[in-house]
Amino acid sequence: MSMTDPIADFLTRIRNANMVRHESLEVPASKIKKDMAEILKNEGFIKDVEYIEDDKQGIIRVFLKYGKNNERVISGLKRISKPGLRSYVKSDEVPKVLNGLGIAIISTSEGVITDKEARAKKIGGEVLAYIW
């Protein structure tokens, strides 16, 4: 069965594993998912990310992060730009998620970056997701 929105599937797998407090999860690899996973790791939302090569497209293993009392680090994920309704922003319209507590992941001409980087570089793009 073909998947119409692999980014939404990636976010949903993270959300579901986070809700039941799994240590890790695996998703089929793609360049955009690798970039998103690296952003989540660099921003401190996940513990680690590992790439597994196989004969097909490869697998991304994401290790989730929890606080001292097993509280969730990721409290919410939301897909913004969907295949049926794309959402683009100009450089001066880049959104802030929860006044800077969360991040927006944006696909730009310079690759997949966070909202902070997009504001610093003064570039816009397609808003893929909000994570807080």
Swiss-Prot record:
rRNA-binding recorded as keyword: yes
Keyword check for Glycoprotein: no
Its keywords, alphabetically, are: Ribonucleoprotein, Ribosomal protein, RNA-binding, rRNA-binding
Q: Name one GO molecular function term.
A: structural constituent of ribosome
List the SUPFAM superfamilies: Ribosomal protein S8
GO:BP terms for this protein?
A: translation
Q: Which GO terms describe its cellular component?
A: ribonucleoprotein complex; ribosome
What does it do?
One of the primary rRNA binding proteins, it binds directly to 16S rRNA central domain where it helps coordinate assembly of the platform of the 30S subunit.
Subunit structure as annotated in this protein's UniProt entry: Part of the 30S ribosomal subunit. Contacts proteins S5 and S12.
Looking up HAMAP family in the UniProt record yields: Ribosomal_uS8_B (MF_01302_B)
Q: Which family does it belong to?
A: Belongs to the universal ribosomal protein uS8 family.
Protein name per UniProt? Small ribosomal subunit protein uS8
- Which source organism does the UniProt entry give? Pediococcus pentosaceus (strain ATCC 25745 / CCUG 21536 / LMG 10740 / 183-1w)
